[in-house]
């Protein structure tokens, strides 16, 4: 198994050195949006990581990463790592949309579950389909907004 990491962010030297000791990690840098779609389609598991820093948690606590919707649309297993008080992780866990971990022990446990085929992919796929059609469908969202605005104007 190999973890390919695509990122535009500059990695600290210490992190680069730590990664260099692990043969199953490969830093790939950034890619075009067209390449991203191909990479997502070819992947077995898509990994989403939220920062544990207090500042990042404060900044992202109520947001939901659009990258996660892209991951859901790719139809692949999502493995999300980060603090559970961040909306993205909370939503993924509460709606059974991804495998989640919020500490090192959980990361190890979940990686082993993925590796050993112990993940209920049918349940995840069904949950993703339900979530996308219920909460991310453009027509449904527009209809709800129209109804709310109509009520306000009465």
What is each residue range found by the language model?
Residues 65, 83, 95-105, 114-119:
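Conserved acidic donor-binding segment of nucleotide-sugar-dependent glycosyltransferases
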Residues 2-7, 12-42, 55:
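Nucleotide-activated donor-binding/catalytic signature segment of Leloir-type glycosyltransferases, i.e.
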Residues 39-42, 110-114, 148:
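CheY-like receiver
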Residues 4, 28, 45-47, 79, ...:
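Hydrophobic/aromatic beta-strand patches that form the interior of the parallel beta-sheet core
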Residues 19-22, 73, 93-94:
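Short, well-ordered coil/turn elements that cap or connect secondary structure elements
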Residues 102-108, 118-150:
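A charged, aromatic-enriched C-terminal amphipathic alpha-helix characteristic of glycosyltransferases
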Residues 34-39, 46-72, 78-90:
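Nucleotide-sugar-dependent
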């Amino acid at each position: 198994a190999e973890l390919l990491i695509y990122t535009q962010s500059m990695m600290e030297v210490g992190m680069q050195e730590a990664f260099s000791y692990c043969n199953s990690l490969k830093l790939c840098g950034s890619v075009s949006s067209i390449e991203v779609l191909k990479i997502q389609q070819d992947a077995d598991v898509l990994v989403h990581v939220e920062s544990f820093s207090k500042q990042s948690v404060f900044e992202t606590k109520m947001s939901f990463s659009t990258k996660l919707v892209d991951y859901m649309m790719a139809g692949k297993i999502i493995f999300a790592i980060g603090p559970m008080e961040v909306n993205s992780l909370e939503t993924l866990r509460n709606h059974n949309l991804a495998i989640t971990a919020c500490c090192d022990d959980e990361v190890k446990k979940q990686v082993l579950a993925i590796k050993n085929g112990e993940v209920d992919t049918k349940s995840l796929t069904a949950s993703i389909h339900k979530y996308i059609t219920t909460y991310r469908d453009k027509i449904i969202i527009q209809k709800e907004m129209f109804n709310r605005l109509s009520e306000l104007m009465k």
